[in-house]
UniProtKB/Swiss-Prot annotation:
Membrane-protein topology: Peripheral membrane protein
SMART domains given in the database record: AAA
Entry-linked InterPro entries: AAA+_ATPase (IPR003593), ABC_transporter-like_ATP-bd (IPR003439), ABC_transporter-like_CS (IPR017871), ABC_transpr_LolD-like (IPR015854), LolD_lipo_ATP-bd (IPR011924), MacB-like_ATP-bd (IPR017911), P-loop_NTPase (IPR027417)
Source taxon at top rank: Bacteria
Pfam families documented for this protein: ABC_tran
Name of the featured protein: Lipoprotein-releasing system ATP-binding protein LolD
Subunit structure, interactors included: The complex is composed of two ATP-binding proteins (LolD) and two transmembrane proteins (LolC and LolE).
Transcription recorded as keyword: no
Compartments reported by the entry: Cell inner membrane
Keywords: ATP-binding, Cell inner membrane, Cell membrane, Membrane, Nucleotide-binding, Translocase, Transport
Protein family membership: Belongs to the ABC transporter superfamily. Lipoprotein translocase (TC 3.A.1.125) family.
Length: 227
């Protein structure tokens, strides 16, 4: 993969109506993320970091501006096409995991592959390999309720990586992890950004993690500022 932009936004803004008032959460944001680049976004609670991730990932629509993922303008796509593009090009790690409770760890990780019609044996092989890489080779057949918070987070990270997307977005990825496991996740991001040119966009309060990224941006008063 070349160092082209895997994600970009121009003049991005988001506002919400609260009664007769309109509250501007984000305003005039511009961002470009290239293949293999790792970018951290920091900011105080309530600054709009998760809102920004949802806009960049096509989970919400901006009030102003546009987002391009893998060269496709998200607002120009219908819901189905947008969903297929996200599944193919984007991995997303939510702060609270969003694992399917009735499925095992390996079944959860297989899900993006099965949606993309990967044969079941290949899907299971790739899912198992990733779960082993995040230290869960012994927990393949456990359901989310049988896993700790940190283990569920690692399953979510494996699920985000299994489709080999060009971009992975992570919302507080190390919040429930001990130092050793968090360092392992950071090393995995470093390895994938170098070897596979996977780009990572990380929202975090963990300044140690942020400092290990290629760039750090602060979301302040609705604007992104390089720090």
């Amino acid at each position: 993969m070349s160092d082209k932009a895997v994600l970009s936004c121009r003049n991005l803004g988001k506002s919400y109506d609260e009664g007769p008032e309109s509250v501007q959460v984000l305003s005039g944001l511009n961002l470009e993320l290239r293949a293999g680049e790792r970018v951290a976004i920091v900011g105080s609670s309530g600054s709009g970091k998760s809102t920004l991730l949802n806009l960049l990932g096509g989970l919400d629509r901006p009030t102003q501006g546009s987002v391009w993922l893998a060269g496709e303008e998200l607002s120009a796509l219908g819901e189905r096409a947008r969903g297929l593009l996200r599944n193919r090009e984007l991995g997303f790690v939510y702060q609270f995991h969003h694992l399917l409770p009735e499925f095992t760890a390996i079944e959860n990780v297989c899900m993006p592959l099965l949606i993309g019609r990967t044969p079941i044996p290949e899907a299971r092989e790739r899912a198992e390999a990733l779960l082993k890489r995040v230290g869960l080779g012994h927990r393949l057949n456990h359901k989310p309720a049988e896993l700790s918070g940190g283990e569920r987070q690692r399953v979510a990270i494996a699920r985000a990586l299994v489709n080999r997307p060009g971009l992975v977005m992570l919302d507080e990825p190390t919040g429930n992890l001990d130092h050793h496991t968090a360092q392992g996740i950071q090393e995995l991001m470093q390895e994938l950004s170098s070897a596979s040119r996977t780009a990572f966009l990380v929202v975090t309060h963990d300044l140690n993690l942020a400092r290990q990224m290629d760039r750090v941006l602060k979301l302040d008063d609705g604007h992104l500022v390089a720090i």
